[in-house]
Amino acid sequence: MQNTIPVSEVSRIRFFRSLIAIWLLMGASLFVQRAAAQTTPAGSTLPSETPARLQPVIDSFDYERRDVMIPMRDGVKLHTVIILPKGAKGAPILLTRTPYDATAQTSHAPSAHLAPILQGYDNATEVIVEGGYIRVVQDVRGKYGSEGDYVMNRPLHGPLNPTPVDHATDTYDTIDWLVKNIPESNGKVGILGISYDGFTPLMALVNPHPALKVAVPMNPMVDGWMGDDWFHNGAFREQNMGYIYEQEGTRDNKIKWWTSHFDDYDVYMEAGSAGELGKRHGLEQVGFWRKLLEHPSYDAWWQQQAMDKILADQPLKVPVLLVHSLWDQEDIYGAMAVYKAIKPKDTGNDKVFLVMGPWHHGQEIDDGSSLGVVKFDSDTGLYFRREILRPFLDQYLKDGAPKADVAPVMAFETGTNNWRRLGSWPSGCPPTSTSSNCTIRATPLYLNAGLKLSFESPKSGDAPFDEYVSDPAKPVPYRVRPIQPMGYDTGMTWSEWLVDDQREQSGRGDVLVYESETLRTPVKISGQPMANLVASTSGTDSDWVVKVIDVYPDEVAGQPGMGGYQLMISADIFRGRYRESLETPKALEAGKPLLYRFALPNANHVFLPGHRMMVQIQSAWFPLYDRNPQTFVPNIFWAKPEDYRKAVQRVYHAPDRASFVELPVVMAK
């Protein structure tokens, strides 16, 4: 049977066909309209809402910012940020020269007010804002916005730098430009800074510009081999490798050091030697790293750029305020070495000043009421900035300012938590109108049999030595693991490690621990302790770490967490191969007792009654310092896995082989 469609259905189909035709026509029309729109001239597009160049309205700001490029004598231009208080007139200039980004250091907050934009590294904000100073921060050549080539701690013109420019000439040229081009200034300039930025004020003292009236080097880099950033007595500070990589890898520090482990202890152990780790990171592309590999010993390359040695040969023309942190985890050597070098030139006792505070590296610019768990009963950082730094700067930089009431040495005394006004350093107590009422006596604190510590020398018949096994496969960590990398990011505690509780180390079998009886009277030390260690090793090279420690009572009222705390007061490391000469390493004679005598960092401390004194001896401080293979090799940077061997270490304490730490004990006259 054939299918048929009713008439009504035919009508319905015709209707829908007509409707579809209408839709198709409408669609075609829309398509034509869109196509026409796409061929519309560009001038009719929706315009950008971003201005070609935004002009911020800053009438309400209480400061003016100027970014300039200052020409140096060789034609290179250095990026410089100038911050002026609004309405400034006849104002002095505070200059900082930095490799750490001048823009960032003057842009800490998006604020209309001067204090927030400066709150941070290098900026003593209270001094700058309350004192009405013009703040100038400059990128050193080769970094961030500045032209030229970057060289780490660029040496002075001479054997190590054949060019006509250095930090001394760049500072001179910068100051010359500033006083001629900032009409709001009074023509007087002070220079200050921390760490690397503390090194540049020292350079400014070489042939200083006449307008430079005062310098404040804080925690400065001075001698990278003896005891600042790169080595301590020949032991390489390998945790600094990341800094070198980032600082010299690019102009703006954008390429970051990478790691494959959470614990830095594992990072450096897995690689083996520092040289091998550097190779794995491509660090040999970096010029400063290649120089370190070539100069592991204290040769002319190091000696000729040591700032204490350089300044010892320079005339003293500019007043200097050296700032030292007693627990400086980076540059604990520098400020004190410069003070010792230039103070003899200060015949009037009015040009070289010293501040010693209870701080980590650069903490004087921050809250100084505590360091880690150690409390100081007041904000020592604020005291420094308001009572010492500001009046000191005002005296030399402000027209008509009064003389600052600042003693030649302002030293915080840890233990008692008091500031001491001293005539010089070391000095046990303030001078009277006629003479000092105390003296400092080098007093041996002896290691004795039975792991005892005493001011009494060893006795005949007692055990002549103690020993331990030092295993490079299990080096003593310098702090409790997991060990963080160096740095100051939120959550990082790198700045606190020198005040870490040493109980973790004192419980190890490869650390010798000598402890005194409980003190009945206070023992005050002011100056540099000297390690006098008679020791032997079964190997042919060895590191020796000596730590002077204040042991708190078992219970501390009000601070239960400090019960039994072992607080380092002074500590350092010495690489045995340099026992006879810092310039020429020599293998040690295995098994032979030898004398190792080396200085520890300055201390100004009182061991209180109820406390005990402690000395710890060990042969590794890893991974802050690279491992000694304990087998003599020409260059430890390239020690092979088979070079790292266990060694039996002996520390002697017989009458004819006495080991002791010589303490600068303050005695009443």
Predicted regions and their residues:
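C-terminal, loop-rich substrate-recognition/catalytic regions characterized by aromatic stacking residues
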Residues: 41, 51-52, 259, 269-272, ...
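N-terminal cap/lid segment of alpha/beta-hydrolase-fold proteins
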Residues: 50-88, 515-521, 584, 588
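Cap/lid segment of the alpha/beta-hydrolase catalytic domain
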Residues: 86-181, 229, 365-376, 506-508, ...
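Active-site-adjacent alpha-helix of alpha/beta-hydrolase-fold enzymes
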Residues: 120, 333-352
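Alpha/beta-hydrolase fold nucleophile elbow
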Residues: 183-195
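Glycine-rich nucleophile elbow surrounding the catalytic serine of serine-hydrolase chemistry
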Residues: 193-203
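Short beta-strand/loop motif that positions the catalytic acidic residue
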Residues: 322-324
